[in-house]
Amino acid sequence: MKIGIIGAMEQEVAILKEQINGLATTIKAGCTFHTGTLNGAEVVLLQSGIGKVAAAVGTTLLISDHNVDVVLNTGSAGGFDSSLNLGDVVISTEVRHHDADVTAFGYEMGQMAQQPAAFKADEKLMAVAEKALTQMEDKHAVRGLICTGDAFVCTPERQAFIRSHFPSVIAVEMEASAIAQTCHQFSVPFVVVRAISDVADKESPMSFEEFLPLAAESSSEMVMKMVTLLK
């Protein structure tokens, strides 16, 4: 099995990159691909760049050029579930766009035309994520809906909009729905496993930039355990 792993930013993939044996790096269309073995498994680690277009381009190349069998999306996310704290893990059951609106044509809010309203994460990959979680000491995780948009959600108004239209949302970020839609169109299984870097409506002593390395450490640990279980 060849495992595709996607992170948007250098900070989100750096720990995983350091652990790859036989590392080879290529760049195409602004996307950086690191290939080799991780914990004995064949992997392709993609640094896609930030946002949905970059993520869709990178995921397309990951699947079409590198022929990965599964896709794991890692990195950071903003927490919307009240039980979440910095460093906790979120596991997708489904992913939706929060900034798509073609409701004038009878679609649901967040549903892109001619696409499903939600992109379901693969059941087997979710089970692997759950098993990996049991190997992490005292790590809290929440499973559920992750929403994506091309905006860093930091205003009360935008938070309220997302909550009103997607009341079950547990976290938001900027790439997962594009990755999920691309995987859907290629019939490639995916799951999103991210760590919380900030939480809506909660004060934090650290800024997003300060906590990002810690979130990356948490999500990378989870991914490495999943890779070991998948190989």
From Swiss-Prot:
Pfam families: PNP_UDP_1. Keywords: Amino-acid biosynthesis, Hydrolase, Methionine biosynthesis. The keyword Hydrolase applies. The keyword Amino-acid biosynthesis applies. GO terms for biological process: L-methionine salvage from methylthioadenosine; L-methionine salvage from S-adenosylmethionine; nucleoside catabolic process. Substrate binds at G78, V153, M174, E175. It comes from the Bacteria. SUPFAM superfamilies: Purine and uridine phosphorylases. GO terms for molecular function: adenosylhomocysteine nucleosidase activity; methylthioadenosine nucleosidase activity. Coiled coil: none annotated. GO terms for cellular component: cytosol. Pathway: Amino-acid biosynthesis; L-methionine biosynthesis via salvage pathway; S-methyl-5-thio-alpha-D-ribose 1-phosphate from S-methyl-5'-thioadenosine (hydrolase route): step 1/2. The active site is at E12 (proton acceptor), D198 (proton donor). It is an enzyme of class 3 (hydrolase). Its EC number is 3.2.2.9. CDD domains: MTAN. It catalyses: S-adenosyl-L-homocysteine + H2O = S-(5-deoxy-D-ribos-5-yl)-L-homocysteine + adenine; S-methyl-5'-thioadenosine + H2O = 5-(methylsulfanyl)-D-ribose + adenine; 5'-deoxyadenosine + H2O = 5-deoxy-D-ribose + adenine. Catalyzes the irreversible cleavage of the glycosidic bond in both 5'-methylthioadenosine (MTA) and S-adenosylhomocysteine (SAH/AdoHcy) to adenine and the corresponding thioribose, 5'-methylthioribose and S-ribosylhomocysteine, respectively. Also cleaves 5'-deoxyadenosine, a toxic by-product of radical S-adenosylmethionine (SAM) enzymes, into 5-deoxyribose and adenine. Belongs to the PNP/UDP phosphorylase family. MtnN subfamily. This is 5'-methylthioadenosine/S-adenosylhomocysteine nucleosidase. The lineage of its organism: Bacteria, Pseudomonadati, Pseudomonadota, Gammaproteobacteria, Vibrionales.
